[in-house]
Amino acid sequence: MKRPSGRAADQLRSIRITRNYTKHAEGSVLVEFGDTKVICTVSVENGVPRFLKGQGQGWLTAEYGMLPRSTGERNQREASRGKQGGRTLEIQRLIGRSLRAALDMSKLGDITLYVDCDVIQADGGTRTASITGAMVALVDALAVIKKRGGLKAGNPLKHMIAAVSVGMYQGEAVLDLDYLEDSAAETDLNVVMTSAGGFIEVQGTAEGAPFQPEDFNAMLALAQKGMNEIFELQQVALAD
């Protein structure tokens, strides 16, 4: 099996995390997984949604979108169509669920964190790149809140999280699929994990023949290997 990119089966794409990419948001990152590029921002606002009023905890919610020409052919903006597509809703819910799992909401205080992930160039793995980059932006946003005198109850961050894709390509488990691999993969998995080694979410679909338990285990093992490398890259970015 030869991957289109020439990478080894267990090799990530080149990953770059650039912090403070925009000047207005409390946390902002440009994350690059190969040719996939996503701007992730975290904005802080006082108050919480109505369903959390008086409960003494904060909230985090996420939105996701793709620029019209982030792909090979131009896609119409969802705003001009008047509604978000099912894929967009699914991805932004995944991002929100994943990042909430990193926080102790009771320590956040009466604030809402708005996470925005905007894909400026797509070459596979946009949702996993979004989660990985937004996590770093979230850490920076929490630091800003603390500097402003917030987080009196302590640091709400429980652990780092990151995400990566794995799949079965030409009968072999491969890590971090790009678009060419993703479009031809027999199976595609998106895995979200904590830095402590726990799983937050595993999304998997067989595109053709069902995958076998041994395939699933091989993909999970690759995801864990890749995730360890991604967590190191997050820490390097945060130390910069």
Swiss-Prot record:
Molecular function (GO) terms for this protein are: 3'-5'-RNA exonuclease activity; tRNA binding; tRNA nucleotidyltransferase activity
Q: Which UniProt keywords apply?
A: Nucleotidyltransferase, RNA-binding, rRNA processing, Transferase, tRNA processing, tRNA-binding
- E.C. number, please? 2.7.7.56
Question: What does the subunit comment say?
Answer: Homohexameric ring arranged as a trimer of dimers.
What's the name of the protein?
Ribonuclease PH
Native organism:
Pseudomonas putida (strain W619)
* GO BP annotation list: rRNA catabolic process; rRNA processing; tRNA processing
Which CDD domains does the entry mention? RNase_PH_bact
Highest taxon listed in the record's lineage: Bacteria
The entry marks the following residues as binding phosphate, namely: R87, G125, T126, R127
